[in-house]
């Protein structure tokens, strides 16, 4: 019961994080570094390698339902990372959609916690989206967007909550996950980030999807 109350508090906290973010030259990694999802289903996207290349034909009003449909318990972590990256960029176009998506993803996690059976995948999704929204807000705050994009970018304030702690808890519930270690490395700094990346690399089989994503990330 204590554990359930603790997680409920984490998910509902509204205090803003005041720490200065890591501002890598290539931009915040959860937003600016596309992930290779392999053959898994992902949200529609434009062609080309650019990080900010949404499909102009996509109906953003469908974002919450489409994203929840893709965030199944069976979906691999790397596919969820790319879907949540794309979802964050789409959500930046419409503040109502952004709030709706975050609320829906948090509700899934909170529901599992309230039921006394915290779901690792739901907690990961919630933590990852919180940190993605934070990094998206950092991009606007620190003038990292081209003027036309900045004018349309509505994710300007950080959401409350500590998404990183939810990802760490998700890893514990999952019994360890190299893919989640990789994700955690992209939302932490210094020694913590390096340790997450080291553990992910140690567990990544040669030629695996994780190995490819680690190699891609090393270029930034």
What is each model feature region?
Residues 97-113, 140-173, 193-207:
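Alpha-helical repeat scaffolds
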Residues 9-19:
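Bacterial N-terminal signal peptides
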Residues 24-85:
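N-terminal leader/linker segments that initiate helical-solenoid repeat arrays
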Residues 20-22, 26, 91:
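N-terminal export/targeting leaders of redox proteins
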Residues 45-46, 72-92, 115-150, 176-190, ...:
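Amphipathic alpha-helical repeat scaffolds of TPR domains
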């Amino acid at each position: 019961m204590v554990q359930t109350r603790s997680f409920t508090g984490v998910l509902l906290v509204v205090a803003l994080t005041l720490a200065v973010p890591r501002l890598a030259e290539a931009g915040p990694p959860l937003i600016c570094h596309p992930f290779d999802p392999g053959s898994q289903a992902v949200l529609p996207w434009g062609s080309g390698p650019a990080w900010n290349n949404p499909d102009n034909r996509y109906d953003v009003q469908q974002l919450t339902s489409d994203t929840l449909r893709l965030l199944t318990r069976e979906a691999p972590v790397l596919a969820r990372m790319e879907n949540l990256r794309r979802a964050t960029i789409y959500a930046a176009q419409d503040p109502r959609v952004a709030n709706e998506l975050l609320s829906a993803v948090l509700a899934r996690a909170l529901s599992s916690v309230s039921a006394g059976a915290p779901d690792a995948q739901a907690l990961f999704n919630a933590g990852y989206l919180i940190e993605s929204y934070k990094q998206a807000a950092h991009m606007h705050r620190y003038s990292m967007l081209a003027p036309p994009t900045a004018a349309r970018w509505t994710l300007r304030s950080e959401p409350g909550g500590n998404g990183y702690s939810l990802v760490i808890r998700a890893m514990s519930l999952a019994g360890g996950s190299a893919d989640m270690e990789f994700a955690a490395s992209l939302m932490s700094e210094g020694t913590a980030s390096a340790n997450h990346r080291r553990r992910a690399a140690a567990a990544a089989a040669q030629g695996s999807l994780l190995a490819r994503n680690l190699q891609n990330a090393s270029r930034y």
